[in-house]
Regions:
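Patatin-like phospholipase
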Residues: 1-174
Length: 174
């Protein structure tokens, strides 16, 4: 909550089987915990909690954004899907199905826009070498939708006013 643009980050407490929503604390730890996939990366210890990837319990936290910020409009991006039935010899997929809860990837048209990317079989969890491809795909998709987004999200704060607020924020930093 102390950032210029308030931020939320979702991780998972697998011991207590619940999501954790970070609104304060160490930003680096929160972001790192939110993408710590079990069996691939070690958990991040935050307080007494071993935190893992937030996608285990909430892979599309639009509900968190609605609850904490009551936004007029949400721009969502779906890059994964709920698990398919795993094959008998795919132990990792079986464990993933055991621990991951299904996510609701829906936004009402009046409250937002959802960008869907069907990447099944094309990009895997550890395909870090495809980051530029994914960035370019997301950028191109956003450009295709930008006119419809601008129609629904007019600028509500004049740019000069926003810049003054940014400068005041920067001056308040230690």
């Amino acid at each position: 909550d102390s950032l210029f643009v308030p931020f939320r980050c979702v991780a998972s407490d697998v011991y207590n089987k619940r999501e954790i929503v970070f609104s304060q604390g160490d930003l680096g730890d929160a972001v790192r915990a939110s993408m710590t996939f079990p069996l691939v990366f070690r958990p991040i210890k935050i307080g007494e909690v071993l935190a893992y990837d937030g996608g285990i319990y909430n892979n599309f936290p639009a509900d968190v954004m609605k609850r904490d910020f009551a936004p007029d409009y949400i721009i969502g991006s779906v890059v994964s899907s709920n698990n398919e039935q795993p094959e008998a010899d795919d132990i990792v997929a079986q464990i993933e199905s055991l621990i991951m809860q299904a996510s609701n990837y829906e936004l009402p048209d009046t409250n937002g826009i959802l960008m869907n990317f069907d990447l099944q079989g094309e990009v895997g969890l550890l395909d870090f070498d495809k980051a530029q491809y994914l960035f370019d795909l997301g950028y191109a998709t956003t450009l295709e939708l930008i006119d419809s987004i601008k129609k629904k999200v007019p600028r509500s704060v004049p740019l000069d006013s926003l810049n003054k607020r940014r400068e005041a924020y920067k001056e308040s930093l230690p």
